[in-house]
Amino acid sequence: MVIDKSIPKATAKRLSLYYRIFKRFHADQVEKASSKQIADAMGIDSATVRRDFSYFGELGRRGFGYDVTKLMNFFADLLNDHSTTNVILVGCGNIGRALLHYRFHDRNKMQIAMGFDTDDNALVGTKTADNIPVHGISSVKERIANTDIETAILTVPSIHAQEVTDQLIEAGIKGILSFAPVHLQVPKGVIVQSVDLTSELQTLLYFMNQNHLD
């Protein structure tokens, strides 16, 4: 199957949502799904679904719909969800602790293998209820050496985000999901995905205000 390498970011961000929808269809024993059914489940229009799918070659036939099992497996392959992906979490503050206790593996094949914080943090040397150990950040390089871990969730204060990012890159991390509302400088080959909760809330409030004006 030919896959277009220039997939727009908006499409890429919907991939996990498509995967979730097809898993739900499969659980409901739906065998075929039309672009309209997929669009309705996603809250988007069917033209967007067809355009997104066009980047991945021929996924279905016009008038026949999409094979649910085939597409579920396709997105599982695309998102590497056949084997467990281990990640680390850095920053055990309020957001970090909440994520440490979130059961990612109940929904997808990913899990937090270790947590890290400043060496003097009270949580260092302890384990969560799910047996996730928390270590001092100074040991991150040796802790993930000889493991398959290349991904980190970053939930540290903004003023420390770049410094910690540099440590993670030196340790071999290639992908960072950052909750710090600052731009992180990273070398080519390292990918940063930012989650700015304040910005997302402000965007929500903006659209709510536009609704009131209408």
From Swiss-Prot:
This is Redox-sensing transcriptional repressor Rex. Keywords: Cytoplasm, DNA-binding, NAD, Repressor, Transcription, Transcription regulation. GO terms for cellular component: cytoplasm. Belongs to the transcriptional regulatory Rex family. Homodimer. Modulates transcription in response to changes in cellular NADH/NAD(+) redox state. Disulfide bonds: none annotated. NAD(+) binds at residues 91-96. One of its GO terms (biological process) is response to redox state. Residues 17-56 bind DNA. It is found in: Cytoplasm. One of its GO terms (molecular function) is DNA binding. The lineage of its organism: Bacteria, Bacillati, Bacillota, Bacilli, Lactobacillales. It comes from Streptococcus pyogenes serotype M1.
